[in-house]
Amino acid sequence: MINIFIRRGGLIVRESLYSSDEQIKVFHEEDKILWIDLFRPSSDEVNYISQTYHLEVPTKEEREEIEQSARYWEDSGSITINTYFLVRSLESELHNETITFLLRKNILFTIRYSEFRVFDEIQQIVLATPKVFEDGFDLIGKIFEIRVEKDADLLESAAKNTRALRKRVFNSQVINYDEMLEELSSLQELNMSVRDSLFDKRRAITAVLKSDKADADVKKNITIVLKDLNSLVEFTAVNMHALDNIQTILTNQINIEQNKTIKLFTVVTVAMMPPTLIGTIYGMNFDNMPELHWDFSYPVALVIMILSTIFPIIYFKKKGWI
């Protein structure tokens, strides 16, 4: 599907094409296209836009490359940006997906293959406040601004959950290590995904600021977004350090529990050695063992074996080993 946002008079209107057979209508001379959003476009739709506006649309392989030259490039007439945006999958898991932004003749082209809330919001804002958006640079600046705000909300929620997890680790009487490790892993994955997304957007915004195609007002607004990005990158580092600290604490507690178990088995083994030795001696059944012929030899042997078990346990108890 192709959504086209056109400035018409004092308003911005949206026209949608749902089929590759449709063609972009011939607009009046006073009409001005601001934004063409390609949502899950077919190859025919991509080719049509590419040929109509003389765009070099990156392939799927080029979109996923991580080199700086593949994430941002600029020529005499256009700017191309491939950058990560977080999206929630059908399994409600957050992951990064590449969105392509192309700027040519002050028109913004976006190519995406998933539904992003930020695009729904920006479309409503564009239609509601047409005076704010003069060209594609204003649009891309607003898109990054809204996405960074959402990233900040995600990090704030992650930090809150991290603090709650830390309290549970210290205060819980009975610790479910499997559950806590699973939650810890989930928080670490979220933090890394947000960090990767922030790093990628920061590279893109830094490159736009160096471009002579963006005017002073656009650069001023994007600079504010960049400052917010830098703050969030620092926040992810702090949050990751807190998560690493929790992981260390959990690992130490697991080791302590394992050591307690090993110590218990060691004490039991040592405590059972004397009675085992006694039982082994009197189980040899040699003829010249007068104790075996006593009437009370069996109860005496049992008492000795019990006492030889109790004394080591008392000793270990005084030492604080059990």
UniProtKB/Swiss-Prot annotation:
Mediates influx of magnesium ions. Alternates between open and closed states. Activated by low cytoplasmic Mg(2+) levels. Inactive when cytoplasmic Mg(2+) levels are high. GO terms for molecular function: cobalt ion transmembrane transporter activity; magnesium ion transmembrane transporter activity; nickel cation transmembrane transporter activity. The record marks N259 as: Essential for ion permeation. It comes from Helicobacter hepaticus (strain ATCC 51449 / 3B1). The lineage of its organism: Bacteria, Pseudomonadati, Campylobacterota, Epsilonproteobacteria, Campylobacterales. NCBIfam families: corA. Pfam families: CorA. This is Magnesium transport protein CorA. The keyword Cell cycle does not apply. Keywords: Cell inner membrane, Cell membrane, Ion transport, Magnesium, Membrane, Transmembrane, Transmembrane helix, Transport. GO terms for cellular component: plasma membrane. Gene3D superfamilies: CorA soluble domain-like (3.30.460.20), Magnesium transport protein CorA, transmembrane region (1.20.58.340). A motif (Probable selectivity filter) lies at residues 283-285. The gene is corA.
